[in-house]
């Protein structure tokens, strides 16, 4: 059963992924993303290093470590100068939890289905911050594995991203449009996620690969929304102009399907 976080009637739905055709690899083998490295080297590096080692030895430790991250490493923004709330680029505890997800992938080894189920359980049992951490962890897995996460992880990740996109919490929605979403959400779901950010007033800097995935349909949606706002005497966000200039056709096709 896929979790839900709000009753947003316009929310996109998840797309069913094709089953994996290749055995899973250990996604943590490649260098982790910059934010994860920064978290691991921060002032609380000792606790985080011990926690990650514990998770690598016993994946069940993630159930305890993930909720503790905020209290142990802090909840400040990763980029306080440009993102003081930590909504767009995430927080220190987001990065620490992403590192926990990488450690969890190592602990599960080639058991891709076990990893996928564990990530789903952590997300479903978690509060908003922990759910963000799982989503940021999916981004870390997407960046760390040369061929991306294994099939079962992608399938579950799509479900979790779709759930987050039904939420009204801006930080959760922003965490669901990172590199994992850029690589694996279908175009219909991805477009609606981008437009939802505009509705919420969240900078589109949160969206990974925006220029690569923007297309004529997204530009049309943005123009229509801008027209509606002008007719209602409401301000038009600058990001709508940014979307209105999208390319006439998708420049890349990364997800398995186009429209549901």
PLM segments and residue spans:
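N-terminal alpha-helical scaffold/docking segments in eukaryotic complex subunits
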Residues: 1-109, 188-260
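Eukaryote-skewed repeat-based solenoidal scaffolds used as protein-protein interaction platforms
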Residues: 96, 101-232
């Amino acid at each position: 059963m896929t979790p839900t976080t709000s009753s947003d009637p316009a929310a996109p739905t998840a797309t069913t992924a094709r089953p994996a055709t290749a055995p899973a690899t250990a996604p943590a083998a490649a260098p982790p993303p910059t934010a994860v490295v920064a978290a691991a080297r921060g002032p609380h590096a000792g606790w985080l290093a011990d926690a990650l080692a514990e998770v690598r030895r016993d994946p069940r430790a993630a159930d305890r470590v993930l909720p503790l991250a905020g209290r142990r490493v802090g909840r400040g923004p990763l980029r306080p100068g440009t993102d003081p709330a930590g909504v767009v680029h995430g927080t220190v505890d987001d990065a620490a939890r992403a590192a926990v997800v990488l450690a969890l992938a190592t602990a599960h080894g080639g058991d891709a289905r076990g990893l996928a189920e564990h990530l789903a359980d952590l997300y479903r049992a978690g509060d908003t911050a922990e759910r963000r951490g799982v989503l940021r962890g999916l981004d870390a897995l997407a960046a760390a594995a040369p061929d991306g996460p294994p099939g079962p992880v992608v399938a579950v990740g799509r479900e979790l991203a779709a759930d987050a996109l039904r939420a009204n919490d801006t930080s959760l929605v922003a965490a669901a449009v990172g590199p994992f979403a850029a690589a694996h959400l279908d175009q219909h779901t991805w477009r609606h996620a981008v437009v939802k950010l505009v509705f919420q007033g969240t900078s589109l800097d949160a969206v990974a690969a925006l220029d690569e995935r923007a297309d004529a349909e997204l530009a049309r949606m943005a123009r229509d929304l801008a027209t509606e706002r002008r007719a209602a005497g409401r301000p038009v966000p600058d990001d709508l102009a940014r979307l209105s200039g999208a390319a006439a056709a998708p420049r890349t096709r990364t997800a398995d399907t186009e429209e549901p």
